């Protein structure tokens, strides 16, 4: 079954009301909005806007960064003290609320001054619809040069050399394994002998579960979130040589997707044994990531697969939790690939209709200052796109180990959009296939599906949909082909570096 995602923004624009926008905390109108909604940010080619000294400015900022909300609010207070003519109206939405409300606000001509690209949308598409303005002339080259290698990429944050959006953080893997030292000790597992292979991991999980007697289990998972489960299985398959890449990527090997590869089936076999062994916390099938994280902190499981964001949450909410982080186990015959991740992803940009882009740029420069970024890194669970900050501010012992493991156990995967920005149009054309891989994993957790048959069907339907989308974009006059999504020089044990795109 194919779920159509095309035309979502237009549908939302027609069905969402302005009352619903206000109800979610987004003020889509104010006394200054009539002028601002139609303001032109450039009066002529190459000419920028300069806000008059003493002019009162309200910046509307909307995003979904709830994990940094406390830091952000303190930042806003300081920013307004240092810039008394500026008032910041900041709204934090869930990612679902963001999709449902901000897209509608944009279509209605009431976009916030600063906002991120909605999840699943590509830069080329939103720039074509005039959502963002290029910021180079407002922020300056010195500011842009402060970003680390791989943070600003053509087709991702930048088009034709013009930067439209900035990444929130450096992109690191989010499928390392946290281990609960208290649970392992109670089960008689030596922390210095953590499992490194699939068989070892399975045996340790069985030992922990037996020792727990219903009090704790080998592993707990976020079964209510299909995306988390898919990331987990993709990572397992990657260690077996699957070349799965990130969940958002269209990657082909020998002209085919890898969703039913031998490595993927092996990964599902391994996961299935953990469930059949009874090593999974019985509530896993219904838990969202925050709930699984909380039960792990209550010493109900030895292992949890999640990302670095857990660290600061546990430090704040569960200061007595004794935990560490380890690499994902690999097949018994050794790793044939590392955990794939892609470069920093697009986030915040300045609205094309922003009446005071120079003030918005000043906000961004302060947001990415070493002072503010250092605080986020010090909290743990955050890796800044400003390299110099990470070198001095990363002090949490578990976060340091996480960062080290990211360097050792992960490898940068190729990105078709970096290789050829026109491929973004294919992503916009593709519709989701159901059941997805994550939904199939949910079935494994519930022991309710024949995952081998489902994977075969998923791979077949995905291949048909990818080829249909490529043909549709090609028919519109854009030079794209299946070869644009294949990287024959990709060694999954190594980083795919910028120079490799030229020789693929």
Name each model-derived stretch:
Residues 44-51, 120-176, 231-232, 239, ...:
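Hinge/lid segment of periplasmic solute-binding proteins
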Residues 78-154, 185-188, 193-196, 295, ...:
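Extracytoplasmic "Venus flytrap"/periplasmic binding protein-like
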């Amino acid at each position: 079954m194919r779920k159509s995602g095309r035309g979502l923004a237009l549908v939302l624009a027609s069905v969402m009301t302005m009352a619903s926008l206000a109800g979610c905390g987004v003020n889509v109108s104010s006394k200054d909005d009539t002028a601002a909604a139609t303001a032109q940010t450039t009066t002529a080619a190459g000419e920028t806007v300069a806000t008059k000294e003493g002019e009162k400015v309200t910046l509307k900022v909307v995003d979904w960064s709830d994990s940094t909300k406390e830091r952000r609010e303190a930042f806003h207070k300081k920013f307004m003290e240092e810039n008394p003519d500026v008032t910041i109206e900041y709204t934090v939405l869930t990612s679902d609320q963001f999709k449902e409300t901000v897209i509608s606000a944009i279509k209605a001509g009431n976009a916030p001054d600063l906002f991120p690209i909605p999840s699943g949308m590509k830069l080329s598409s939103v720039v074509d619809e005039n959502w963002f303005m290029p910021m180079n002339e407002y922020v300056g080259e010195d500011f842009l040069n402060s970003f680390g290698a791989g943070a600003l990429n053509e087709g991702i944050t930048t088009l034709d050399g013009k930067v439209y959006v900035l990444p929130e953080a450096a992109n690191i893997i989010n499928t390392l394994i946290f281990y609960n030292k208290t649970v392992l000790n109670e089960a008689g597992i030596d922390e210095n002998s953590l499992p490194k292979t699939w068989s070892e991991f399975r045996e340790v999980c069985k030992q922990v579960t037996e020792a727990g007697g219903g009090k704790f289990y080998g592993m707990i998972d976020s079964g209510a979130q299909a995306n988390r489960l898919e990331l987990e299985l993709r990572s397992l398959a990657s260690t077996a040589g699957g070349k799965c890449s990130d969940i958002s990527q269209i990657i082909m090997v020998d002209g085919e997707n890898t969703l039913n590869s031998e490595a993927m089936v092996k990964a599902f076999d391994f996961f299935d044994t953990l469930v059949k062994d009874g090593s999974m916390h019985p509530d896993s099938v219904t838990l969202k990531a925050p709930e699984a994280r909380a039960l792990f902190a209550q010493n109900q499981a030895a292992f949890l697969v999640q990302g670095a964001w857990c660290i600061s949450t546990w430090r704040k909410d569960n200061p007595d939790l004794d935990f560490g982080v380890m690499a994902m186990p690999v097949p018994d015959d050794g790793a044939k690939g590392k955990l794939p991740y892609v470069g920093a992803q697009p986030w915040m940009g300045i609205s094309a209709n922003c009446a005071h882009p120079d003030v918005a740029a000043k906000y961004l420069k302060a947001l990415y200052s070493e002072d503010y970024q250092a605080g986020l890194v010090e909290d743990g669970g955050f890796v800044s796109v400003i390299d110099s900050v990470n070198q001095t501010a990363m002090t949490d012992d578990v976060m340091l180990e996480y960062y080290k493991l990211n360097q050792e156990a992960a490898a940068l995967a190729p990105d078709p959009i970096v290789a050829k920005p026109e491929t973004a149009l294919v992503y916009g054309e593709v519709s989701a296939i159901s059941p997805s891989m994550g939904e199939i994993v949910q079935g494994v957790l519930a022991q309710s599906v024949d995952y081998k048959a489902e994977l075969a069907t998923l791979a077949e339907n995905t291949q048909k949909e990818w080829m249909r989308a490529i043909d549709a974009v090609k028919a519109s006059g854009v030079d794209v082909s299946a070869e644009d999504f294949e990287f024959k020089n990709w060694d999954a044990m190594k980083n795919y570096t910028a120079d490799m795109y030229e020789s693929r």
